[in-house]
Amino acid sequence: MSRQLLQALEMLESGNWDGAHQIAQEDMTEMGSWLHGVVHIIEGDRGNAEYWYRRAGRRFPGMESVMGEIAAIRSALKG
């Protein structure tokens, strides 16, 4: 699934948050939940973003952290 999550990150970076959201919804792992939270940050939906960060077992970083979170997810996936 990590290949699909990397694809979703590329979608986010190119502005296709809907495509990234579809991938994240299908991945119920902690990484998928983390990515799902980032998608909701981009949407401006703080409540859902916080929910998905909790599901991922991660501290919610705030609404301004998108690029840093994308980089952190990419690094974790390539780890």
Task: Name what the model sees in each region.
Residues 6-10, 39-40:
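Residue-level signature for tetratricopeptide repeat
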Residues 5, 12, 17, 24-25, ...:
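Inward-facing hydrophobic residues that define packing positions of alpha-helical scaffold repeats
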Residues 19-20, 49:
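Solenoid-repeat scaffolds in large eukaryotic assemblies
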Residues 4, 33-36:
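TPR repeat positional signature
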Residues 21-28, 57-58, 78:
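A conserved position within tetratricopeptide repeats
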Residues 28-30, 42-64:
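TPR/TPR-like (Sel1-like) alpha-helical repeat modules
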Residues 37-46, 63-79:
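TPR/TPR-like alpha-solenoid helical repeat scaffolds
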Residues 1-3, 29:
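Short, low-complexity N-terminal intrinsically disordered segments enriched in polar/charged residues
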